[in-house]
């Protein structure tokens, strides 16, 4: 993409309403624009990152054997009355009446709807196990939306639902989700720690939240510092292997890590004092096992091998897709702007022409642009007739992992400058070597 033809409305000044780093930088980098309180339009740069995150989530869910689908944003209130949650959910749920006087709601979650789909179409234990998921916009009428996409009223979320014949099978589904979430977050450049949490309005007595440690986090968390040394890495997982998935769960949850709702001071005191930590965390996902809560209430049953009609065991599993953008920025930025991890960057590399209109510089930039594009990457070429300082400031603000700078002086020596946004280190390379190094960084991604 050529910046002269792109829509990137960057701001020089920080809007007064932005209270935290991610909100400030998303507004300044032209990623979002507020439409109303807690509701945002996603401008091209922000939308590209959103799609990158969606792609990772889809890939990892399907790697785990989960089946994608799509449910509507509007739901019938009758289903929620059936489960008993219509009145329990409170004012966060936006209630709507259509022209025929039917009560509807803008779904804050989908347990009732997916249970209705299941009970209408599945009747035998032979159809189990089954895990369905979707990525859809949701709405919760927050009293005081703030912090940009971190606590908005409208947000994009992946939620998945497993249906199993037994508790043991449902807990294996729980473990599969934990593994797939760990893989997803690491691909996004995040360390998200699974912590024992409270079930809230969704319910269930077994649940983990995934939290990214950050000073701006809304949750207070308590944990054993050893857990921050864990990494999923590039290990291979057989999602059908019960023991292997259970081992990952035990590895990542055996140390003390809890949110404030479930914090146990006596248990925490058993952690060696030097390893005890308290901090703030940003919730970016949560997994639940809630047994037969919804299947009992809504009649989601199957015939087992002994011809008995039994309720299915269920779980619900969510990732805050739009919130992840804010969490990534909170975890990866400096005083100049965003520092995108390579897995979610909107463009793979920036190209800065220091002297637009110079024949040699223009030709070299076009050559770099073509070479990167042919290699399957998406470069952003700043071909505007602007001063160099302004071009550098824009590139630093939007945070692309790599920048190739081209100028007449360097070209006379046969080199361009390749700069890492993360480290700030630069090196002079031939144009061909610069392209090769950038391409190698994304090989296999």
UniProtKB/Swiss-Prot annotation:
Class of enzymatic activity (EC top level): ligase
Cellular localisation: Cytoplasm
GO BP of this protein: prolyl-tRNA aminoacylation
Residue stretches spanning the membrane: none
Enzyme Commission identifier(s): 6.1.1.15
Principal place of residence: cytoplasm
Reactions it catalyzes: tRNA(Pro) + L-proline + ATP = L-prolyl-tRNA(Pro) + AMP + diphosphate
Signal peptide (residue range): none
HAMAP family: Pro_tRNA_synth_type2
Function: Catalyzes the attachment of proline to tRNA(Pro) in a two-step reaction: proline is first activated by ATP to form Pro-AMP and then transferred to the acceptor end of tRNA(Pro).
Name used for this protein in its record: Proline--tRNA ligase
Organism: Dinoroseobacter shibae (strain DSM 16493 / NCIMB 14021 / DFL 12)
Lineage summary: Bacteria, Pseudomonadati, Pseudomonadota, Alphaproteobacteria, Rhodobacterales
Gene this protein is translated from: proS
């Amino acid at each position: 993409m050529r910046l002269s033809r792109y829509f990137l409305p960057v701001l020089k000044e920080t809007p007064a309403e932005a209270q935290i780093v991610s909100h400030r930088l998303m507004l300044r980098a032209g990623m979002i624009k507020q439409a109303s309180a807690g509701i945002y339009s996603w401008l091209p740069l922000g939308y590209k990152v959103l799609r990158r995150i969606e792609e990772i989530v889809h890939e990892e869910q399907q790697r785990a054997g989960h089946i994608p689908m799509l449910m509507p944003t509007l739901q019938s209130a009758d289903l929620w009355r059936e489960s008993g949650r219509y009145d329990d959910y409170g004012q966060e749920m936006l209630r709507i009446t259509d022209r025929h006087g039917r009560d509807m709601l803008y779904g804050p979650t989908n347990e009732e709807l997916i249970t209705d789909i299941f009970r209408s179409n599945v009747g035998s234990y032979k159809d189990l196990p089954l895990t369905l998921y979707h990525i859809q916009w949701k709405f919760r009428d927050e009293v005081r939306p703030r912090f940009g996409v971190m606590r908005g009223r409208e947000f994009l979320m992946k939620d998945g639902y497993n249906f199993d014949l037994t508790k043991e099978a449902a807990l294996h589904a729980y473990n599969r989700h934990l593994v797939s979430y760990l893989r997803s977050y690491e691909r996004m450049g995040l360390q998200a720690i699974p912590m024992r949490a409270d079930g809230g309005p969704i319910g269930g007595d077994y649940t983990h939240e995934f939290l990214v440690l950050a000073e701006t986090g809304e949750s207070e968390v308590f944990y054993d510092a050893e857990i921050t040394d864990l990494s999923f890495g590039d290990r291979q997982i057989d999602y059908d292997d019960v023991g292997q998935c259970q081992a990952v769960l035990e590895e990542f949850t055996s140390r003390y890590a809890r949110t404030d709702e479930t914090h146990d001071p006596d248990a925490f005191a058993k952690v060696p004092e030097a390893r005890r930590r308290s901090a703030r965390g940003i919730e970016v996902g949560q997994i639940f096992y809630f047994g037969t809560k919804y299947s009992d209430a809504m009649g989601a049953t199957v015939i087992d091998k002994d011809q008995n009609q039994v309720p299915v065991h269920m779980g619900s599993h969510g990732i805050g897709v739009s919130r992840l953008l804010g969490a990534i920025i909170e975890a990866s930025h400096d005083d100049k702007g965003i520092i995108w991890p390579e897995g979610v960057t909107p463009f793979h590399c920036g190209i800065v022409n220091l002297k637009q209109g110079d024949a040699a510089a223009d030709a070299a930039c076009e050559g770099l642009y073509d070479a990167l594009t042919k290699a399957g990457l998406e470069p952003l070429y700043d071909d505007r007739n602007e001063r160099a300082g302004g071009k550098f400031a824009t590139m630093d603000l939007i945070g692309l992992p790599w920048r190739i700078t081209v100028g007449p002086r360097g070209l006379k020596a046969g080199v361009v400058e390749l700069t890492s946004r993360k480290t700030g280190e630069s090196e002079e390379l031939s144009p061909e070597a610069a392209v090769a190094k950038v391409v190698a960084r994304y090989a296999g991604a």
